[in-house]
UniProtKB/Swiss-Prot annotation:
EC number: 3.1.-.-
Additional remarks: Despite having conserved helicase domains, this subunit does not have helicase activity.
Name of encoding gene: addB
Name of this protein: ATP-dependent helicase/deoxyribonuclease subunit B
Provenance organism: Ruminiclostridium cellulolyticum (strain ATCC 35319 / DSM 5812 / JCM 6584 / H10)
Family stated for the protein in its record: Belongs to the helicase family. AddB/RexB type 1 subfamily.
Pfam family, one: PDDEXK_1
Record carries keyword Glycosyltransferase: no
Length: 1149
């Protein structure tokens, strides 16, 4: 018996030496048992390599094993596979059960026990303890040496409790993967299965105590054991230099020598493969220099420009992968490499793998991404989990529609979309899903409106869809009510899936993907279905006869599913391998691309301590309990990983890094890059931060049709913007144009480049269809046209509406309060009450009564059907009561009397519509509703003032009238004025146009403020805004109490009855204003009927018409495009506006 070390630096040929030794032994003694042990992930490659070296087409006489394969082989032969194997998901379920049962006994882990992810953390710790041969009772001796009140003592007691409970639940029931090597070593002790065999152990960077124990048993049995070690020298004073990159390897060597000597096993002369020129790098002096100098402090710089080593700095991750793909194509095209010779590795595979898959497909690079995909985002798993969440979250919107959008329910997507709109609009959740009665809530928010016929049909279809969804779900819930076993829940879920046809749909998907050649997806769906069934089995096994509610089962089930991942196998031999740096295999890799060589990524900086801190591990180590490395040691181990990675390729190494992440945050290059620059002062460095300018540089962008076409699009767009491009793009365009499969795309590209974000005029025939033969508009809608013609067209022409969400928006609040004030005003009018005689209590009672009546009439709307909105409506009573009382105060202080409420002008209204005749002969009718008309009859005529109720802040600006943004009140006044002129009725004189704000504002007051002072302050805060007739006597009639500044109207009278600073205009100015607005409306309607709907929003100071627009995704307004710019509007002094209007009025007349 003997132990031999085969050692050498990376690339020295250790694996090749093992394979040749096996060949020699096999030829010399064909009856001897030969065994090659390699890491689990390398067994297939090792078998291929051995077949290649042997040249026999098979390896019947040699076993290629991993330690786990050896465990299965031995236990299968000598016994030990008695109990079912438990999957990590089952382990996590057990740990969850233990935490649920014991968490009240914990002090250290009491809060952590309820934290998401703590189960996985404990599972990782238990795995570590088992791999390092630490049993629960191992902590007893440590605990004896710690004070009872010591923090670590409490922690170890709780870990021991959890660990011992975990083991007791496994014993005589399950076989844990983490125990297999321990069981293997015990079985090897009592058998001679590997007696007189020759064993080679290759490819390990380090060994766990479990593996060391197995190797010690093999050393006792085998004729010879050969272990490869990646190191410069075999033995050294490890303690003297922990920073030595090979320190861990040398420590392992000493450990094995000690074991061999303790069993009296001979130490055979070691095989040293270190030479000045290592075999792997025989074709590359640069890579040889890198291996020699990277870990050497007294390095020797390589002074020549590099050909085999390249550094690349990229703008972002996407372009980094693109440049990697181009270079792979170049290596295969120019240097004769095959895809199978190339490996792409990164320390952040999760952040790169999806983009690599997409970009490599564009470049026609076949690749195999060596990673496992979590199944929690798979449609089947998402459907089952969200189905359980429907009940644990009480039919929440999120859970219901996550379930429905899984695509496996069999319900049509259009039905789901309609249902979703309705549910969002009506805020449906909870018991409203399960109630027997049909849903009948109207999504329209209009007091006194009846249900529309089209809504009846829509509700009928929605209720059909709802029943299709809820009935099988309710049947499942009835089968699983109360406390049940895991078996009951799993059976219930399976029956539910079969009932709604999910099992058959999965089969159909698998068949469809198989027939279309999408084998990866077919395998994925098959795996996920099998995994789901496996989790059912694990849950039933682990939870046994224990009973619990649905919520607890859902938590256990989710924990079980989270441990499963989907794996795939390579589709062909000739493809690029993409994987994590930790798992790449050095054998036969000619070119290595390392992506994401950034600071904190590679080498890694995110090393968490876990449950046991570094200090805890140090205490345990001193007391004889060896565990995995602490963060300090792992940081040194990271240097060994860097060394192994950089020395992996035989011919070519390329390191790249992005300077920014997905969110644009700066990323720095790794310390590896600075080290490379020192060793190779003339290293080849490239970057895509500065765009290439010469044709020679552009050629590098041409690697494959799809990305080349994308680059062509970019080049032509830049040329379109006036940036000169190289001649090469003309040739590339000619090539694509000449290819049948690309010609249509070229035409589409040219059309796209010619595209300008300009809304073309709408055809007149379509305008007639949209607005009718006798169009009518409200003035507020025409103000929208002024704000942005295109937004007007989308909203009122095409009828696009924002998705209704269950809330009372400001317009809804305004509508409701308007309705209350309207009813109150009509009640006053119909009963001939006088506003001047009301008291506050009576107003409050009447408002409350009207609100209740409105709620009753709206019981089938959002407001009427919701307790929350009913409560909101009650709170609005206070606001409306304040508004009504304020109206009362205004009328009391004024000589004007209300003569009309909610007065319509339009067909069937109190006044006919305003008719605007266009130059084309077309007639446009303007309609509207005036909230309130006040009148004062005098000898020279009747003064009228228009009052418009606003639930939000609204100021009157003459410049806004000039720009067409505030035409409503002037038009209302003009409608009355015009009707008076035509009907030869009493003479109408404009008294004013005013905005009345409906609000109950907060005001500043002191402890000494009297109720009268508070009321006065509120009235000042809610003072009406608008434009009055510049007549001192008339203003006094509007506010009989005015002294100086009025507290109810925008006016001031100075001493001597002189009109002070006021928002006022003369009768002549009102006439000009009337004429100007009428002409403005005519011009606007003329443009509208011509179909002119340009994307032309305005900007005034910081406010733009895009600020609150819902249609920005439709118009795609973009200031970076020349044709897209704001119309700049500026506030002007009133005198300037009057001059401009007078000039226009003179021209028109």
């Amino acid at each position: 018996m003997g132990l031999q070390f085969i050692y050498g630096r990376a690339g020295s040929g250790k694996s090749f030496h093992c394979l040749n030794s096996i060949k020699t032994k096999q030829n010399k003694d064909s009856n001897k048992k030969l065994v090659l042990i390699v890491p689990e992930q390398y067994t297939l490659q090792a078998e291929r390599d051995l077949i290649k070296v042997l040249g026999t087409g098979g390896i019947l006489k040699t076993e290629v094993l991993s330690f786990r394969r050896m465990a299965y082989r031995v236990l299968n032969e000598v016994g030990g596979i008695t109990y079912p194997h438990i999957h990590p998901s089952g382990k996590n379920m057990i740990i969850y059960r233990i935490l649920e049962r014991l968490k009240d006994q914990f002090t250290i882990f009491h809060k952590s026990a309820n934290c998401k992810g703590f189960v996985n953390t404990l599972s990782t710790l238990i795995t570590e303890l088992k791999r390092y041969n630490v049993r629960a009772e191992s902590f007893d001796e440590v605990l004896q040496g710690l004070a009872d009140d010591n923090y670590l003592s409490h922690k170890l007691k709780e870990i021991k409790l959890i660990y011992s409970e975990f083991d007791s639940m496994l014993v005589d029931r399950y076989r844990d993967t983490d125990d297999e090597l321990t069981l293997l070593s015990s079985k090897l002790e009592g058998t001679e299965i590997y007696a007189k065999s020759e064993i080679w152990i290759d490819g390990f960077a380090g060994f766990t105590p479990q593996e060391v124990e197995v190797i010690s048993k093999l050393i006792q049995q085998a004729e010879n054991v050969h272990i490869t070690m990646c190191t410069d020298i075999l033995f050294d004073d490890v303690q003297a230099d922990l920073t030595d990159v090979f320190a861990a390897v040398k420590k392992s060597c000493k450990k094995f020598v000690s074991i061999a000597e303790s069993y009296g096993v001979k130490i055979l002369p070691p095989v040293c493969l270190n030479t000045p020129n290592l075999p792997r790098f025989k074709d590359s002096r640069e890579l040889q220099s890198l291996e020699t100098n990277y870990c050497s402090y007294s390095y020797r710089a390589y002074q020549l420009p590099t050909q085999d080593i390249e550094l690349f700095e990229s703008v972002n991750i996407y372009t980094e992968i693109e440049e990697c793909a181009r270079d792979i194509i170049k290596q295969c095209r120019d240097n004769g490499m095959q895809f199978k010779d190339i490996t792409v590795a990164t320390r952040n595979l999760t952040g790169y793998e999806n983009l690599i898959g997409v970009i490599f497909e564009q470049y026609n690079i076949p690749c195999f991404i060596d990673s496992k995909t979590e199944i929690t985002n798979h449609p089947l798993v998402r459907m089952v989990l969200s189905m359980l969440e429907i009940f644990t979250e009480n039919w929440s919107y999120e859970s219901v529609f996550r379930y429905l959008k899984s695509g496996l329910t069999g319900i049509d997507n259009t039905k789901i979309d309609i249902l979703e709109n309705y549910v969002l609009a009506c805020g449906i959740r909870g018991s409203r899903w399960t109630q027997e009665a049909d849903w009948n809530t109207s999504i329209e928010f209009r007091p006194d409106d009846g249900q529309k016929p089209e809504n009846d049909e829509m509700l009928l279809n929605i209720n059909k869809t709802r029943n299709e969804i809820r009935e099988p779900l309710i049947r499942f819930r009835n089968r699983t009510k109360g406390r049940r076993t895991a078996g009951d829940f799993c059976a219930g879920i399976y029956e539910y899936l079969v009932e709604i046809g999910v099992e058959q749909r999965i089969r159909n998907y698998i068949e469809k993907f198989t027939q279309s050649g999408q084998l990866r997806l077919a395998g994925e769906y098959q795996q996920v279905w099998n995994i789901l069934m496996d989790v059912f089995d694990q849950a039933v096994e682990v939870m046994a006869d224990e009973t619990f509610g649905l919520e607890k089962f859902a938590n256990v089930f989710k924990i079980g599913l989270a441990e499963y991942k989907i794996s795939s196998i390579p589709a062909s031999l000739d493809q690029v391998l993409v994987g994590s740096i930790e798992h790449i295999r050095s054998h036969e890799i000619k070119a290595l691309y390392i992506l994401g060589t950034n600071d904190g990524v590679f080498p890694s900086a995110g090393m968490s301590e876990g449950v046991l801190s570094d200090a805890d591990r140090e205490v345990l180590d001193k007391r004889g309990i060896e565990l995995a490395s602490d963060t300090k040691t792992r940081a040194f181990d990271e240097q060994y990983l860097i060394y192994r990675t950089l020395t992996t390729p035989k011919n070519y190494l390329r390191l790249s890094w992005p300077i920014a992440d997905h969110e644009g945050r700066t990323m720095r290059p790794s310390t590896i890059i600075s080290r490379m620059r020192k060793i190779f002062p003339k290293v080849t460095e490239k970057s895509n931060i500065v765009k290439p300018s010469a044709d020679k540089q552009h050629i590098d962008l041409i690697a494959s049709p799809i990305p080349a076409f994308n680059q062509l699009v970019c080049a032509l767009r830049q040329k379109n913007e006036g940036i000169e491009q190289g001649e090469i793009w003309r040739e590339i365009f000619a090539w694509f144009s000449g290819q049948d499969e690309w010609k249509q795309k070229c035409d589409a590209m040219i059309n796209a480049l010619k595209y300008r974000n300009i809304a073309a005029p709408v055809d007149k025939s379509k305008i007639r269809e949209l607005y009718g033969k006798s169009p009518y508009f409200t003035v507020s809608r025409l103000e929208k046209y002024t704000s942005c013609p295109f937004a007007f067209y989308v909203q009122y022409g095409l009828g696009a509406r924002e998705r209704k969400i269950y809330r009372m928006s400001p317009p809804d609040v305004g509508t409701f309060m308007h309705a209350v004030i309207e009813r109150f005003s009509k009640m006053v009018d119909e009963n001939n009450y006088s506003w001047r005689e009301f008291d506050r209590q009576w107003c409050s009672e009447q408002v409350s009564k009207i609100v209740d009546e409105l709620l009753d009439s709206m019981k089938n709307t959002i407001l009427g059907g919701s307790k929350r909105f009913k409560a909101l409506a009650v709170r609005l009573k206070r606001v409306v009561t304040r508004a009504v009382w304020l109206i009362t105060e205004h009328i009391r202080r004024s000589s004007f009397e209300p003569v009309g409420y909610e007065v319509d002008f339009g067909d069937g209204g109190a006044y006919p519509p305003m008719v605007i005749e266009l130059d084309s002969g077309e007639k446009i009718r303007l309609v509207g509703r005036i909230d309130r008309i006040d009148a004062l009859r005098a000898e020279n005529g009747t003064y009228l003032r228009i009052v418009d109720y606003k639930s939000g802040e609204k100021d009157f600006k003459l410049s806004d009238v000039y720009y067409g943004l505030q035409m409503q009140l002037i038009t209302y006044l003009d409608a009355l004025w015009e009707y008076s002129d035509k009907s030869n009725g009493e003479k109408i004189i404009p008294g004013g146009i005013l905005y009345f704000r409906i609000d109950d504002p907060m005001i500043r007051c002191t402890d000494n403020s009297t109720p009268e002072e508070i009321e006065t302050a509120i009235m000042k805060k809610l003072k009406m805004k608008g434009l009055l007739l510049a007549d001192v006597q008339l203003i006094k009639y509007m506010d009989n109490t005015i002294e100086g500044n009025s507290i109810i109207i925008p006016a001031r009278i100075n001493k001597g009855d002189v009109l002070g600073k006021s928002s006022a205009a003369t009768i002549e100015q009102f006439t000009v204003l009337r004429s100007y607005v009428k002409q403005l409306l005519k011009d606007m309607c003329s443009e509208l009927m011509k179909g002119n709907v340009p994307i032309s929003p305005y900007k005034k100071k910081k406010l733009t018409s895009c600020s609150y627009c819902n249609y920005s995704s439709v118009c795609q307004f973009d200031q970076s495009q020349k044709e897209n710019s704001f119309r700049m509007l500026h506030d002007r002094e009133d005198n300037d506006i009057w001059k401009l209007m007078n000039e226009i009025d003179v021209k028109d007349n």
